[in-house]
Amino acid sequence: MKDYKTTLNLPKTNFSMKGNLSKKEPFILKKWNDNNIYSLIKKQNIGKKKFFLNDGPPYANGNIHIGHAINKILKDIVIKFKTLSGFDTYYTPSWDCHGLPIEHKVEKTIKKENILITKKEFRIKCRNYAQSQVNNQKLEFIRLGVFGDWENSYLTMNFKNEANIARTLMKMFKYGYVYQDFKPVHWCINCKSALAEAEVEYHNKLSNSIIIKFKLAHNINFWNQIFKNDHNQDIHLVVWTTTPWTLPASQAIALNPNFKYQLIQTNNNLFIISEKSVPDTMNKMGIQKWKKIHIFLGKNISNLKVIHPFLNTTIPVILADHVTQELGTGIVHTAPEFGQDDYYACKKNNINFTPTIDKKGHFLNNIHPKLNNINIFKSIKIVIKLLNNNNALLHSEKLVHSYPYCWRHKTPIISRATQQWFININHNNLRNRCIKYIQEVKWIPHWSKNRMIEMIINRPDWCISRQRTWGVPIPIFIHRKTGKLHPDTIKLSQKIIQNIETNGIQAWFDITEKSFLGELFKQYKKVTDVIDVWFESGSIQLSNIYNKIQHQHNNISDLYIEGLDQHRGWFMSSLIISAAISNQTPYKKVITHGFVVDKNKKKMSKSIGNTVHPSEVINTLGSDILRLWTASTNYSKEMSISQETLIHISDYYRRIRNTARFLLANLHEFNPENDLINAKNMIILDKWAIGKALHIQKKIIKSYKNYNFHDVIKYLMNFCSLDMGTFYLEIIKDRQYTTQKNSIARRSCQTAMYLILTAFVKWITPILPFTSDELWEYIPGTNKNKFVFLELWSNQLFDLNHKDTMNHEYWNQLLIIKTEVNKALEHARQNKIIRKSLEAHMTLYVNETIKCNLKLLNKELKFLFITSKVEIKNFYEAPKDAFQSETITNFKTIIKKMNGIKCPRCWHIITKIKNNKNHEICKRCILNTIGPGELRQFL
């Protein structure tokens, strides 16, 4: 028998079946770098509508983690799809380069090297370390396939940027937003510095929960106020606290003016407790019987004092609205040094205080002999012992509760009153204006808007000063005695900032008061605090690089994309600064993505060992797999990743790659400049496929525009698996392989595949840039850009005429019918009736509507089902053993094995072959090899 393989148009391509992404991607990266791909894109898009994506700067510290990777990938997907949509996109990668993470790394190095250095030398080491981390992280981000202006990245430590940050701060001073005060702020005793709201995270903590008593001093006053007599029996106020270490700083005892309080008697004791709290408190104290003596409102007592249980002091009883009775006794001790509520309550009552601890969290030496230089958390046992020795401890137990922790050290923090600089959130109606601007922004997901509003409503004034070395300074002079600003502060700062722009932040620290102020140095001193890094990052929007290119945007970025934690962080700081200085929002849209968790929805942790490192995924599976996982996951929720997940995603990738490969392989020897078929001459199925691709493209572009990337993947997978894989590509194999090379039948098919492929490669480009770049090089034709990233969405796809009989609705019905036929064929295979569908002689028993639709295909119907013979009969003629469709009511199938001979060329079973020395193939194959060629109209 003759080998007919050479007479077939078999698929052929060098585009490999396996991606081998981890090996190929570095070569593709080099090609992009050699061609300066970002500059090429920028150059081509000059004059187009601009799109700005502002980059929330990560810390220049350590290797990137999976959260970093997700964030950069999401941003890159946006930039790439916006470029395909005809925008001139701007993306400048940014880094936070100052702050504690860098300081701690340098401090460890210094300690290890056992050397002493000056603060100036320390800053140099911090700068060098930060730069090295930027260099490393930049390579890691680029390895993800992220495009951006890497050569002009925004580093907060660049001299011009340091100057701009200081300049932005001085505008806040100028407009009256900044003030100095001595009040409690979040304080980390390990950082030895104040913390911003965004630097605090909450964890469950096991604490000592104690109930103690404070004896009324001169309790005759109480008896006179309540009972109008001068009875003198001892009375104790019962107080509950979970921070025993704050008791040495107690300056008052607070009751709520609106609560009812009971004076109760137990044996020989008289206690005052809130009425609601009595049963629970008595139960904890192990007291089963007590007598209610009197009930009174908190506001009905005044001018009372209590004796501190272990300090030789008396402190006043005050009224405060912040006192609650959900937990505890409805009475709290008040330490203004260690809490905002306590601070304001004491301030309202003109109660002054002095510090009891130092910046390291150690008690000062004048508080109590037992507490000298003791760490506050280690002092708890000592305090409880002092209470016990003084018969003041009524109950002690352990309690698990939510407690603030330092996000860097993962250790408990405190509120500590220190002299700090603050931004007044209520000045010039700033808080309400921020709320107004939030409502003008498009928030994705929508619930994040209310979250931001709630945070703005409840947030305190912003503490912007830090007691550290490596950071942008607060470049001002204050009076040595009064603390007031130098009268020429704004003018002086301009000169200082100009110096910083030339020489960096060290320029400020090199300045002496005498050299800069002359004789006034005796009256004024320079501030040595540095600015909160969140203020630094929040100032990016007002930086020079954005001022130059965003003039037509009024310095409003089109989009911010960051993790959930940035509501308190960068989203917040950017908003406050922009609202205060520019009277507008800094962003038009804000996307919040969730945190990464493992397959069990647990937060990733090195100690648990459930982390997934981007480098491991990239080195084994490739960046495109990580990008595909990112896009396929609903980022508005927690994003679960595991090895099992990545295996599943790899299956997605194979489906996408194999679809592209099939299309490409069947474009062998196809030249679009010469071989494209005019739409009016095309086979109807091919026109349907192009129309289907157009419908999918519209859905994909809409999903990109709505930032629903997981929907893009859903549409891609359905298109590859259903529309192409089990329908179109299966049906056209016979026509593509067996018809004549240059026939209308084949060129029509190739035209469809070419148009679909050139659209398809662009659909995947934002998500799979490495694969799309590789694929683009294999797509035939010279009338295209060198890189797919320079292209726009396809405009060559066209639709079927909805007025035609064989419109999309018609083909949708055929898709449903073919699905049911495939089930019947599979049933026949399982029952050993046939091995392959071409062995089938199929009879369909259908209603009149389906019969009419199928008969439109005439003799080509068998190609729809990939069988050798199809007959159509009335549904009522169906035998009892016919295969019944579960989806279509009036649809049954009988499948028998086709009697006949298998054509060695097309593999169809035919009843008769003209067999002589010249012909051993079917009539159709004779037409396609030595005849004029087979004619097709529908399939």
UniProtKB/Swiss-Prot annotation:
It comes from the Bacteria. A motif ('HIGH' region) lies at residues 58-68. Its EC number is 6.1.1.5. It is an enzyme of class 6 (ligase). A motif ('KMSKS' region) lies at residues 603-607. Its cofactor is Zn(2+). It is found in: Cytoplasm. The keyword Protein transport does not apply. Zn(2+) binds at C903, C906, C922, C925. The keyword Ribosomal protein does not apply. Keywords: Aminoacyl-tRNA synthetase, ATP-binding, Cytoplasm, Ligase, Metal-binding, Nucleotide-binding, Protein biosynthesis, Zinc. One of its GO terms (cellular component) is cytosol. L-isoleucyl-5'-AMP binds at E562. It catalyses: tRNA(Ile) + L-isoleucine + ATP = L-isoleucyl-tRNA(Ile) + AMP + diphosphate. Belongs to the class-I aminoacyl-tRNA synthetase family. IleS type 1 subfamily. This is Isoleucine--tRNA ligase.
